[in-house]
Amino acid sequence: MEDFQLLPLEKGNTPEFKREMQKAFQCGYKAEYGPCREIILPERDIDQSLHAPDASAYAAWVNGRIEGGAVLKIGPAARHNHLELLFVRAGTQSRGLGHAIWKRIEQLYPETETWETFTPYFEKRNLHFYVNCCGFHIVEFFNPRHPLPEMDEDGRVGGMDREAGQYFFRFLKTMRSERRQEESALILKWSAAQCRKHRTELEKDAEAKK
């Protein structure tokens, strides 16, 4: 991607970062339920993630402008980490930036064994993104019979209405198994190359003996 950088969020860029994140979440909700007067992702919720212990925030810069970003919660041993929030500027989705952000995050924390994140059930774009693009697996489904722990006293999450806010998915991605798959692929590739090399040498020997 042209001139893409994922850099630690600086204090001076935080207001724009939060504004664009709110717009992105608002557009996702609007696409499913129509216009909403409530702020789907209130600023207090963003601040709670930004100021949480072990929080790390990154802004995605493309051609000198913030086009997305993420907020992470990194565990003490960096083994089980949380993707708290991830967004791409409204109107620029489906161009590969979200995937670029995520792959860069994986590179920044190579010792991570598992990543965890959540998303509401109505966000079909997110479901596709996390499962099909990033390799997460759905491991839990929150609903009225199995409520989300972070739900407000009135049964809501953020500015979403009760129906939308009661249904969430929890995702996990196990990095160790993915690394094993990558290592196995490299071994197979190396073995195939060695077989080709050996076959070429045998053919040369056969030609020399003629």
Residue ranges and their predicted role:
Residues E43-A59, G68, A164:
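A short helix-loop-beta-strand connector motif used in the catalytic cores of GNAT acetyltransferases and
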